[in-house]
Amino acid sequence: VLAGDLLNQCVGSAYAMRGVGAPYLGLYGACSTMAEAVSLAAMLIDGGCAETAAALTSSHYCSAERQYRFPLEYGGVRPPTAQWTVTGAGALILAAAGNGPRVTMATTGTIVDAGITDTSNMGAAMAPAAYETLRAHFADTGRTPADYDLIVTGDLGKIGHAVVTRLFADDGVELAGKYNDCGLM
């Protein structure tokens, strides 16, 4: 089981796994935890280290506010650029054999620091890394946005989505109709 959450030391995931008795790897990738878990699980299976693997992530709005921004009790006014972290969880079971969607490739991103220091504008802060990851994926695989039904980023929101779209437009790559962000859905 590869699992993570938005709390220190992945405490939510660790508590969930404590009585399960399955091998557990705690991951802390913040917004990238699910993509990280899925890609690592696929690599473990492809490398012959596992027949099946579970990829899990969870988050809680109030915990994320406390961890990354301001506790709700603080009473701060949310600026229009602030993200709304979901309270929820998701899990995928990956297997070496069977029917269903397949992980055929993964592109791991790099850290891109655009100098954004406003914790209420994470979309603008994360957008350059999302752009670089997608750009690297297209270059490494020889694919284009036309090869995909939908390209989805995790939580860039309105501003981050606009930044990614503009960066690709500057490259002459049109994403319209192919790109969305979970923060807009």
PLM regions and their residue ranges:
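Claisen-condensing/thiolase-fold acyl-transfer catalytic domains that form or cleave C-C bonds
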Residues: G4-N8, S13-T52, S59, A64, ...
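Short helix-terminating capping/connector loops at secondary-structure junctions
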Residues: T141-A146
